[in-house]
């Protein structure tokens, strides 16, 4: 998107309610738009708004392999509440096994380099897969 397009779009959507802005993007990019949900309160609010407009919109989250049990319960409750299925993307377990075998399970505490490695394997690679085919997220 070019700078001029952003300026034009800002003018077009200026003063609109959040639901109106979401409706615009959900319609314009149908099938190529997704909510990358952290499952935090803000994303739960966006999930409610999006499902009120188009419950077929893709909503996904990442499971790094280090989530709390309550997170899985929240995913289930959210799915039931809105009649949706949040897609869950996981890291490649071979890569996780190799990383943990070589550097330990809490390697991200040991150095910035290991933190980057861990984030790359557990977050960035699954995120790349989740974004395939998407134009807007």
Regions found by a protein language model. Name each.
Residues 1-137:
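ATP-dependent adenylation/nucleotidyltransferase module used to activate substrates
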């Amino acid at each position: 998107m070019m700078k001029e397009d952003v300026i034009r779009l800002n003018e077009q959507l200026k003063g609109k309610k959040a639901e109106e802005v979401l409706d615009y993007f959900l319609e314009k990019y149908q099938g190529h738009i997704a909510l990358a949900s952290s499952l935090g309160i803000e994303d739960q609010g966006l999930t409610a708004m999006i499902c009120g407009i188009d419950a077929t919109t893709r909503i996904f989250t990442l499971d790094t392999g280090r989530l709390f049990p309550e997170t899985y319960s929240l995913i289930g409750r959210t799915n039931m509440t809105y009649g949706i299925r949040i897609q869950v993307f996981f890291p490649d377990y071979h890569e996780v096994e190799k990383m943990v075998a070589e550097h330990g399970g809490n390697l991200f505490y040991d150095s910035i380099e290991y933190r980057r490695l861990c984030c790359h394997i557990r977050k960035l690679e699954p995120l790349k897969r989740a974004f395939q085919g998407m134009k807007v997220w």
